[in-house]
Amino acid sequence: MMTTALTPFSARHIGPGVNDVRAMLAVIGVPSVETLISQAVPQSIRLDLPLTLPAPASEAEALAELSAIMAKNTVLKSFIGAGYHGVHVPPVIQRNLFENPAWYTAYTPYQAEISQGRLEMLFNFQTLVTELTGLPVASASLLDEATAVAEAVGIALRHHRDKRTKVAFAGTPHPQTLDVVRTRAEPLGIEIDGETIDDNTAALLVSWPDTLGVYGDHKAAIDKARAAGALVVFIADPLGLTLTDAPAKLGADIAVGPMQRFGVPMGFGGPHAAYCAVSDRLTRLMPGRLVGQSTDSKGRPGYRLALQTREQHIRRDKATSNICTAQALLANMATAYAIWHGPAGLQAIAGRIHALANRLASGLKAAGVSVLGASRFDTVTVEAKGKAAEIAEAAEKTGRLLRVLDADHVGIAFDETSTDADLDAIASLFGAKAAPSADSTVPGKPRGKEFLTQPVFNENKSETDMMRLLRRLADKDLALDRSMIPLGSCTMKLNAAAEMMPVSWPSIADLHPFAPASHSAGYRAMIGELEGWLSEITGFDAVSLQPNAGSQGEYAGLLAIRAYHRSRGEGHRTVCLIPSSAHGTNPASAAMAGMSVVVVRCLEDGNIDMDDMRAKANEHSKNLAALMFTYPSTHGVYEEGARHLCALIHEHGGQVYFDGANLNALVALARPADIGADVCHMNLHKTFCIPHGGGGPGVGPIGVKAHLKPYLPGHVTEGSAHAVSAAPFGSASILPITWMYIRMMGAAGLKQATETAIISANYVATRLAPHFPLLYKGRHDRIAHECILDTRVLKESAGISVDDIAKRLIDYGFHAPTMSFPVAGTLMVEPTESEPKRELDRFCEAMIAIAGEAAKVARGDWPLADNPLVNAPHTAAETLAGQWTHPYSRLEAAYPAGDADTAAKYWPPVSRIDNVAGDRNLVCSCPPLSDYLGAAE
């Protein structure tokens, strides 16, 4: 279809054109779109009227409208600190990583062979963290500082097998951190017990420095905690760690903190990565992803996700955490910042910040003004003697924001954007002059120069080198900028450039989340509109945008249900019914919310076993808290009895939690609240176009009925509590992506997108059914937006496994569909509405060709031990090897689709990765250069 500047955005977002859709419907065997939708989607849930949303805007109109809204923000220079700091984003990183679709459109690196670039960068992130903390193992990022501290508490509880129930503090953490920890602790019966340490203490949380900016003397508390068997958790500023001793040397078992000030804008609260590092004995208790080094089938080094058996998609309610999506893109950005500056540069930045803080403190003291603490990194807390608000108001008039702690104290946090002019202006507010110089006040022995000695942190200081490093890593990966990613239950749709552009605007990127409310008028207007649109789309009465991942949305929704029952004097309602086919985050979230999980069987056709559901609901009627279910189901079909299911749970006094993972099959056709749900989370990084970022960021807002609205997450800075994320609006700076998508699509465009997603899935299913039976089908043999291909037929006929198929798809230039979920040995395919018909056809032809290759193995044309399927993927080095001994040709290996004359070939950098070896010999960070030098001597 020819497009022009007047073409509606929906026609650019949706891949198949009018003629394509007509051809696809013919293959499916229906005369019209409406016929297919009426066959697939039960009439009982269909919307009677169109959604009430603004008429669609063009890209230019939407950008102009959003720009005008965000211009209402007042972005002053922030000295608020409290975990959020101004940064200079290196342009080479902003342009070549943050704004590069090769980086931001990739999926979580489950398929190691096509993810080596971002796995290598995350491995470098882990190395960075282990070097800063002195602890041997670090994860590949968590969601933010507050949730990272809560996860650290979880590690301590699991370490003590849930037999200890107290958490103590040494130094005061940031208020938002304490609030999130309290939120996590309360459902589990954990007591936040101040400074008291005894034999029931699971963890001591050491703030390094504390929220006042002070490095306290915590040696006695640490010694007491260790004597009592409690784990010591350091909450440490990573930039400050370039100047101080590593937490491990100070007694830490765990260290956590935010990586935001490593080149990631504040963004009104996020997203940014947090880090988590642990001692060796705690490795298997760590939350989130862990990248490890292994080897491929040829003995070459390669990276992979390690120890996945501890994660939610494997262990479910027994998992170490409900974390699924983390902050991979932002962790990669922070790593690039460390690579760009190197250890000397990081120390220079930290040293300059430290000097500014000490010069202010010295100058104030000389003028007779009291400051708190003798040892600090970047923050000076000043005694204002009742004039804190007055001083902050005077600072604001100069274009600077200070932190008012109470009527008598003001906090001033310096960062890499702070200047001598700022220092002088702030000192003058107190009638003082900054000292011309000041001695370092970091505690203990200063960190030396011997850290981050690995070559990657020392060899990329020119922009040419850095640009090429980022390009080299991106070229190793397969993202949406290269080809379709048909992952079922993941909705890898287009992340349009117009949606992404605003994220880099200063009016969006540079605002502190705790700036005065009047300064965030633009953000609050945009957020208010977005909440209203999401309420209209889902049918709920209220929406919270605070949860910064789908897993956190689940948790927030279950906490709302829990609080509702308790408000009615029914705190005994703690049983959560969950179908056996549910996403792994569901049972993990229920366990975190203090609920006990009761699994409900599914039938062979994939539907929930309603007899078992009724029996379980009857059995647990008095204690029933909730049902968690996904719709359409994780089997890719619209179950007929959704309304009856919700009514059944309500009859027994329970609430219905609707998992919105598959909302892309419902938008503008049906609404969860109308079906009977009480709460639902929405993955904005699926249905609403926020990119996956190679494993994050994500946003998982929840919608609730009116009776649950009082129990939505609050925030200490907004006069409430029970937060689930560090910032009031979570990952606020990426919310404009979803705002832009909805604004440009309009109600009709959103409906067309949903219909096209269903058409594309049924088209792929119809084409592939003769070769791979569809495991589940709904009425009229239709599916929703995804299908499960029973690839076990190739295992039975030829010995070819689902792994072999997935790896062979790499040779065809595709990321594999979702493997072995929800059924082992199968592939779940979700094409989304964004893929053009020619790409769908290319995928179908690849799958059909693979079935043909398996037939050759079955006939004996190729031996099972040596064929292009079991040897896949094929690297360029293997294909060009001087001696070729395989029974198939080099062209069959590398260009199975017969496209050797094209320039679009994707070459995997490694052959098949050995997963077992990687877990048996866990290597999760790069050794320092001294290890190599020592080995060579």
UniProtKB/Swiss-Prot annotation:
GO terms for biological process: glycine decarboxylation via glycine cleavage system. It comes from Mesorhizobium japonicum (strain LMG 29417 / CECT 9101 / MAFF 303099). This is Glycine dehydrogenase (decarboxylating). The glycine cleavage system is composed of four proteins: P, T, L and H. Its cofactor is pyridoxal 5'-phosphate. Keywords: Oxidoreductase, Pyridoxal phosphate. SUPFAM superfamilies: PLP-dependent transferases. The glycine cleavage system catalyzes the degradation of glycine. The P protein binds the alpha-amino group of glycine through its pyridoxal phosphate cofactor; CO(2) is released and the remaining methylamine moiety is then transferred to the lipoamide cofactor of the H protein. GO terms for molecular function: glycine binding; glycine dehydrogenase (decarboxylating) activity; pyridoxal phosphate binding. GO terms for cellular component: cytosol; glycine cleavage complex. The keyword Oxidoreductase applies. InterPro entries: GcvP, GDC-P_C, GDC-P_N, GDC_P, PyrdxlP-dep_Trfase, PyrdxlP-dep_Trfase_major, PyrdxlP-dep_Trfase_small. Belongs to the GcvP family. It catalyses: N(6)-[(R)-lipoyl]-L-lysyl-[glycine-cleavage complex H protein] + glycine + H(+) = N(6)-[(R)-S(8)-aminomethyldihydrolipoyl]-L-lysyl-[glycine-cleavage complex H protein] + CO2. The modification N6-(pyridoxal phosphate)lysine is found at residue 686. Its EC number is 1.4.4.2. It holds the Pfam family GDC-P.
